[in-house]
């Protein structure tokens, strides 16, 4: 089976990772003791993508949990689903990274990285045909960003032909823990551009807005934000976990969504969004779901897709839905909004359907878009970065760990280049003479 190994790094990464495992265990009928008690054979058919069947009939997540301090690990371990995980797969330091990317990447994290790679290696050896890795982490702190990107580059070095997907939480001043978040995020994006194949950008600002405006939560907690994220992660991975034709593995997903290797940062959306305990008594129709999906209020990135253009889109519908109705709806959205889709990638919207709905709703839909408007998110972080970097504020925390200032300048310029590339493709038309880019190989050379 095409296995995926999940790595959670840092506080945020472990919190959304734990919420993800709890959600998908529920969908696959795995109880907190790791025993299958489901009723639908579809739950078992591709279970081995994410779970390893242990000798005692238990299904153990292919998960590695990493942090530079023990607090969150203890919380995960003592949580409802804490016994699901293999105890050896919790790896933690004691000192923490103090929200400092350099500590995670070069000092504290570097000391722990070999023991993490040993566990990753063991999980890879337990796989018949490993398709790749998925990392959950945040870009604003020290461990998830610094050590998370260190792990990504080390895993990439050792498994260069496997897919690398990341669920990356982008910081926002609205939900800020620390003043140096723009530094940590920019240094991380610099790494993700080079070492990840697909990055699902989860933007704290957008999560916060959804909680306040759509879910009507006055003071959203981290648990509320994590609940949203786990729903989206469950939706994105539906095609990987249940039988289906389209985007059934990480590589096929990337082939459909990534037109140029550096442009692999996706906006994600989810519908229906309803407050806990407010599940509506009326099921949404396919047209309503589709409309919600394309609404910027349902996007987990605080960028408005109407300010850019879609390069590619994948939508996943779950539940008892008619394939024809879904395809008609998606086509009609495209026809009504053709200005927002680049015309030089024909058939750039793809739809998949899975008959297993998520728990508690009859139908749901998840949306993954490679939209040029994601540049707004990078610009937001970049502006905050340059405001501090121009004054060399807080840099001593990084240089004291042995970092060189040139690395900051390189990261800033790589992220600025990414923004310009998105802009360039946003403006491109079918007839552009300069659409032949020297650095893109012809397809047959790449395969």
Swiss-Prot record:
It is found in: Cytoplasm, Cytoskeleton. Its cofactor is Mg(2+). The keyword Heme does not apply. GTP binds at residues 11, 69, 138, 142-144, 204, 226. Its main location: cytoplasm. The keyword Plastid does not apply. CDD domains: beta_tubulin (cd02187). GO terms for cellular component: cytoplasm; microtubule. Mg(2+) binds at residue 69. Keywords: Cytoplasm, Cytoskeleton, GTP-binding, Magnesium, Metal-binding, Microtubule, Nucleotide-binding. GO terms for molecular function: GTP binding; GTPase activity; metal ion binding; structural constituent of cytoskeleton. Belongs to the tubulin family. PANTHER family: TUBULIN. Dimer of alpha and beta chains. A typical microtubule is a hollow water-filled tube with an outer diameter of 25 nm and an inner diameter of 15 nM. Alpha-beta heterodimers associate head-to-tail to form protofilaments running lengthwise along the microtubule wall with the beta-tubulin subunit facing the microtubule plus end conferring a structural polarity. Microtubules usually have 13 protofilaments but different protofilament numbers can be found in some organisms and specialized cells. Tubulin is the major constituent of microtubules, a cylinder consisting of laterally associated linear protofilaments composed of alpha- and beta-tubulin heterodimers. Microtubules grow by the addition of GTP-tubulin dimers to the microtubule end, where a stabilizing cap forms. Below the cap, tubulin dimers are in GDP-bound state, owing to GTPase activity of alpha-tubulin. This is Tubulin beta-1 chain. It comes from Geotrichum candidum (Oospora lactis).
């Amino acid at each position: 089976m095409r296995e995926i190994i999940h790595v959670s790094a840092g506080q945020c990464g472990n919190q959304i990772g734990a919420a993800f495992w709890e959600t998908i265990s529920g969908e696959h009928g795995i109880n907190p003791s790791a025993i299958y008690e489901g009723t639908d054979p579809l739950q078992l058919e591709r279970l081995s993508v994410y779970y390893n069947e242990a000798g005692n009939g238990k299904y153990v997540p292919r998960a590695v949990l990493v942090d530079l301090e023990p607090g969150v690990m203890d919380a995960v371990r003592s949580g409802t689903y804490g016994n699901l995980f293999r105890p050896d797969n919790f790896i933690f330091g004691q000192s923490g990274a103090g929200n400092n990317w350099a500590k995670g990447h070069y000092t504290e994290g570097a000391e722990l990285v070999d023991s993490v790679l040993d566990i990753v290696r063991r999980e890879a050896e337990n796989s018949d045909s490993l398709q790749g890795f998925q990392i959950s982490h945040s870009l604003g702190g020290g461990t998830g960003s610094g050590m998370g990107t260190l792990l990504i580059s080390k895993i990439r070095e050792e498994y260069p032909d496997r897919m690398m997907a990341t669920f990356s939480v982008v910081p926002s001043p609205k939900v800020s823990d620390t003043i140096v978040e723009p530094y940590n995020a920019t240094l991380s994006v610099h790494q993700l551009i080079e070492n990840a194949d697909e990055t699902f950008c989860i933007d704290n600002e957008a999560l916060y807005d959804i909680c306040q405006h759509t879910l009507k939560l006055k003071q959203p907690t981290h648990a509320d934000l994590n609940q949203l994220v786990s729903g989206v992660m469950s939706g994105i991975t539906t095609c990987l976990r249940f039988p289906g034709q389209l985007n059934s593995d990480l590589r096929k997903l990337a082939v459909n969504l990534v037109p140029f290797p550096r442009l692999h940062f996706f906006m994600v959306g989810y519908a229906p969004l309803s407050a806990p305990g407010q599940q509506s008594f009326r099921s949404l129709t396919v047209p309503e779901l589709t409309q919600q999906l394309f609404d910027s209020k349902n996007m987990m990135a605080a960028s408005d897709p109407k300010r850019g253009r879609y390069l590619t889109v994948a939508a996943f519908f779950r539940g008892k839905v008619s394939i024809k109705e879904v395809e008609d709806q998606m086509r009609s959205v495209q026809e009504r909004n053709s200005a927002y889709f680049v015309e030089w990638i024909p058939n750039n919207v793809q739809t998949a359907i899975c008959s297993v709905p998520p728990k508690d709703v009859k139908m749901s839909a998840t949306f993954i878009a490679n939209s040029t408007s994601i540049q707004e998110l990078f610009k937001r972080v970049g502006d905050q970065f340059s405001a501090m970097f121009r004054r060399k504020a807080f840099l001593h925390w990084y240089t004291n760990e042995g970092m060189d200032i040139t690395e900051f300048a390189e990261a800033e310029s790589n992220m600025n280049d990414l923004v310009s590339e998105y802009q360039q493709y946003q403006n491109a038309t079918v007839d552009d003479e300069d659409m032949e880019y020297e650095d893109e190989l012809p397809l047959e050379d790449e395969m």
